[in-house]
């Protein structure tokens, strides 16, 4: 897998092995997501604080860092996947103040207000397909109630094709 744009364009990153670990977002979808985000922030991510709530391979969050995001906080519940995300980011970004990887459950952490790095301007939501919209809505509500979302925050929710048209009620 490669970074598609920004400072680290073309650089390789590793992805977790095993069928049940993650399902990395394809290059085409990552490019579309990055284009939407860049457009939403007038092509300037310099002050954008990013939360990658379900890290997986880490590719979406790393893509935002590559394109200039101020900071990235990535949550990943699987220890091995979290280690790999850390390794990938370390190979690209030496400025440790710009990123952190948290091994843990973002839903539980958000409900207790324990999500470092906020308030967030951009929340990347690419949960396991089995999640559906309900836990994502709960996560966003908790982030908002805990003061972890910046005014006008942008959330990008990737979901199964079968769920097309559905979205958390709190999305505009």
Predicted regions and their residues:
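Class I S-adenosyl-L-methionine-dependent methyltransferase catalytic core
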Residues: 1-172
């Amino acid at each position: 897998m490669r970074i598609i744009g920004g400072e680290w364009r073309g650089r390789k990153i590793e992805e977790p092995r095993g069928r049940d670990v993650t399902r990395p977002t394809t290059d085409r979808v990552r490019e579309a997501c990055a284009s939407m985000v860049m457009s939403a922030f007038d092509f300037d991510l310099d002050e954008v604080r990013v939360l990658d709530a379900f890290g997986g391979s880490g590719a979406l969050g790393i893509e935002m860092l590559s394109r200039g995001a101020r900071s990235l906080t990535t949550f990943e519940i699987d220890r091995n996947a979290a280690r790999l995300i850390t390794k990938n980011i370390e190979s690209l970004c030496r400025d440790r103040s710009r990123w952190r990887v948290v091994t843990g459950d973002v839903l539980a952490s958000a409900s207790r207000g324990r999500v470092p790095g906020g308030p967030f301007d951009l929340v990347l939501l690419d949960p396991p397909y089995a999640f559906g919209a309900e836990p994502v809505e709960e996560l966003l509500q908790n982030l908002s109630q805990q003061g972890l979302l910046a005014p006008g925050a942008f959330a990008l929710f990737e979901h199964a094709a079968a769920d097309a048209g559905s979205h958390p009620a709190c999305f505009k």
